[in-house]
């Protein structure tokens, strides 16, 4: 894990040259068979360090929950947005992910002066942006966004499980685990499944 001071280096450097509000953005759920893709954008307070903020995939679930609550409590601004399965099926997961990130960024108040992105450039933003390779491991703002997005989506998938427990969304969060695929083979699609995500060996008989 990268030390926290090192993960703030880029953000601090950008503030020194005039970018007062530096946002990080990230998304989760790209590879799932069910549920939305969820994006979060976060502007961290420059004087409030939150220890152990790192890539959400590297943080245990209970610790993610704790960090999520600290991030949203102390951030200058934060926002989440999503693209639902119907939108994903209509425009593809890549475009839906970009739209979710764009929505999250534009929901921030105040709007950031610059956005740090982990991978692809987010279209149609009115502010500067900068790509940071492996940003969720190298940049606190992106790592914080990763945690907020992950916890938000996990909570949503648990809610979806409460509405329809047949698929086990509380366990696999919509990913293509063996028990999830078995449930789809048995019960068919639910209204939160992405019909464009179709492992053909299993799903060709489900139409």
Language-model features and meaning:
Residues 1-207:
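RNase H-like, Mg2+-dependent phosphodiesterase core
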């Amino acid at each position: 894990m990268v030390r926290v001071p090192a993960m703030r280096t880029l953000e601090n450097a950008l503030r020194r040259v005039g970018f007062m509000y530096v946002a990080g953005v990230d998304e989760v759920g790209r590879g799932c068979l069910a549920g939305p893709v969820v994006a979060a954008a976060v502007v961290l307070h420059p004087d409030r360090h939150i220890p152990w903020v790192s890539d959400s995939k590297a943080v245990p679930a209970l610790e993610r929950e704790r960090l999520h609550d600290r991030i949203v409590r102390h951030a200058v601004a934060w926002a989440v947005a999503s693209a639902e399965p119907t939108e994903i099926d209509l425009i593809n997961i890549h475009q839906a992910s970009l739209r979710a990130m764009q929505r999250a960024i534009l929901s921030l108040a105040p709007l950031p002066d610059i956005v740090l992105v982990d991978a692809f450039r987010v279209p149609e933003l009115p502010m500067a942006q900068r790509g940071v390779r492996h940003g969720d491991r190298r940049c606190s703002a992106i790592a914080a966004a990763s945690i907020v997005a992950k916890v938000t989506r996990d909570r949503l998938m648990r809610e979806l499980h409460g509405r329809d427990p047949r698929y086990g969304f509380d366990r696999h969060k919509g990913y293509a685990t063996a028990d999830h695929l078995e449930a789809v083979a048995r019960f068919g699609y639910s209204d939160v499944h992405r019909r464009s995500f179709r492992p053909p060996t299993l799903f060709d008989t489900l139409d």
